[in-house]
C-alpha cells in the first residue's frame, strides 16, 4: 500500500515545487496530507477536511475525499487503520 497515488501528491507533500499546483494550494494540501498520514481512525481525518470528509459513491475499495480549497480535493482510501493512495486532484 502506497501512501500516495501519484507523483504530484508526493511532490506536494515533500515540498517540491510544481507548476501545475498553486503555491497556496500546495501548502494547505501538505498540511492536510500530514494530518491524513497521522490519523489512526477515519474520524481523525475530519480535521484535514475542516470537519468534513465524504465517501465517494460507487468506488471500490471505498474512497473518501476532503476539500483543500475551491476545485482542489484530496482523495484517499482507508485501509487497515490508515490513509493510503492519497491523491491531490484538480476538479476544475
Predicted regions and their residues:
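A short, surface-exposed loop/turn module that caps and links secondary-structure elements
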Residues: 40-65
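Glycine-rich, flexible loop/turn motifs
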Residues: 8, 17, 49-52, 84-87
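Short basic (Lys/Arg) and small-residue
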Residues: 36
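Short linear functional motifs in flexible/disordered or boundary regions
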Residues: 21, 41, 48, 87-88
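Enriched for short, Lys/Arg-rich terminal
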Residues: 57, 64-92
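Arg/Lys-rich, positively charged N-terminal/basic patches that mediate binding to nucleic acids
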Residues: 1-32
Amino acid at each position: 500500500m502506497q501512501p500516495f497515488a501519484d507523483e504530484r501528491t508526493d511532490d506536494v507533500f515533500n515540498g517540491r515545487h510544481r507548476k501545475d499546483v498553486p503555491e497556496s494550494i500546495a501548502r494547505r494540501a501538505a498540511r492536510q496530507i500530514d494530518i491524513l498520514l497521522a490519523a489512526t481512525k477515519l474520524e481523525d481525518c475530519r480535521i484535514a477536511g475542516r470537519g468534513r470528509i465524504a465517501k465517494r459513491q460507487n468506488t471500490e475499495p471505498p474512497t473518501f475525499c476532503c476539500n483543500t480549497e475551491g476545485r482542489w480535493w484530496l482523495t484517499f482510501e482507508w485501509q487497515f487503520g490508515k490513509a493510503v493512495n492519497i491523491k491531490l486532484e484538480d476538479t476544475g
